Amino acid sequence: MENQTLAFAERTLRDHLALLPEGWGRNFEIATGLSGGGDYSYRVRDGKARFTGSTPGNVLLGVYDYLRAIGFVFLYPGKGGTYVPDLRKPEDLEAEKKPFTASYAHRGICIEGADSLEETLDFIDWLPKNGFNAFFLQFQKPDIFFERWYLHTYNPSLPPEALTRQQLDGLDRQVEEAMALRGIRCHRVGHGWTAQALGFPGTGWHKTDREPEQKDLVALVNGQRRFWKGIPANTNLCYADPEARKRLVDQVVRYAKETPGMDYLHVWLADDFNNVCTCQDCQKTTVSDQYIEILNDVDEALTQAGLPTKIVFLLYQELLYAPKAARLRNPERFCLMFAPISRTFEKAYPTSFTPVEVTPYVRNAMALPETVEENLTHLYNWQKIFSGDSFFYDYPLGRAHYGDFGYMKIAKTLYDDIHALKAFHSNGYMSCQELRAMNPTGFPNYVMGLSLLDETIPYETMRKTYFSAMFGPQWEKALSFLEELSSLSSTDYFNNHGPRYRPDLAQNYGKIRELAGNFQIPEGENWEDLRFHCRYTVLLSGALEALCLGKKEEADRRFREFCAFIRSRELAQERRLDVFRVIEVAIHYTGFTLPEGE
């Protein structure tokens, strides 16, 4: 029986070659197969093309590597996102790659934001084009991300469309099928286990007016056992309670049995901090020690069930602090995931590192670490007790990127971060991010994928390749403009690092507003998207300028103007900008306010 991914790889090659002028390559004799040498290799010569890989998914990655080698550039997902080279001679199609092994084994993206089925499928199709090999569907079902789009949260100008359970299950199934077709590794769940253990759906950060039926299973916080801020997924359990732990473990085993199509199952605790249990028994240990014991229970239960499920565990918030006594009994089942959600993106990871003193942990009075050095010291402490498989789980395109109006600063930070991973014994990187983080360009995503695939590609090479394909002969004009915007931007300010009153930054935002307002835009499709970005930048930088000067009323008025503009353009810019997410981050982190109902 023919493997669907190998067949897809051959079809992909033919489809792309058919786009070339003169139809060169349409009659190629194409062969695909599996081999043990590296991740993939290929040879295209004299009308014959041979692609081999260690897995069918790696064969597809080899096909895209070849297409990039002959001049294709995959700028962003969906229609119009592929640059087709102008090749005029058959020999232009000849290329060879000896057995190649990717620089990092884990190269993935985690779903965030508000997502339609079409945009999600386009994104999954785009992932292997730039070297990614994994996609993470958060929660037991990724309902929350689809609901945000179809209900048009934060955009009252579009009619909401409620989805049934059957429809949501269908969306999840189509996404999983698209991943399987391309040989993309499937990661699932993460948060939500605590909600499931209490009898509530683990499908998002949904609020409830109901109280937990068995309150004794819920963490005791501020003298009460109740849902944290009304959200079951953000609520910790009383992990000293054997019944609470058993319920959580049973949910993990049930899900593992019912979901055979995944490659990695993430087992995390609640998605908030300073809300762990303060009962007498829980205070005898640390939440990290309790977490390790829960993971050991999960391993034992999966072993008894005969399930080889790979479990990903999380270093995040309270769990950044290494356990004092507990240790994993079967470390081979586990993969460590380091998630420094509170770090700055104004500074990249260093390639050499000396641990620093970390702030002592105080139960439910923790301040999240912002410096790169303190976050990395937590990782260093965990690595003293776990030396197995691991990857970084980071957030450059989750919140901070909205503060970089040119996307060039965040792209370079990404590049430098990835080139530092091996200094921390990491096997890769997964970005928790909006799928539509493409405004003004998809360059940060492009840099991320190709750097993880092949760390030898220079940043300058990627920059020239991407921008010349995106903007044509005047690409340097676009690059210079975006570089200047980035030089004046602050990812930290938008991400709520530091005081809101910043007259020094206000000057920068004034310059950004002037630059974007005066930029002369040539004709062309991608240039038209840059025209939208200029107006976007004028409005948002104006709101930020007022906020930095302490003019809250004016800042909110300007922010409402910005929201009205992007809402009115949402369908036209759907592939590039997540309107829900930029508004959500601006309200919950940056400091803007919208009137209720807007």
Language-model-detected regions and their locations in the chain:
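Catalytic domains of carbohydrate-active enzymes that cleave complex glycans
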Residues: 425, 450-598
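Contiguous, structured surface segment used for ligand recognition
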Residues: 1-103
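Aromatic-lined carbohydrate-binding surfaces of glycoside hydrolases
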Residues: 33-36, 48, 56, 82, ...
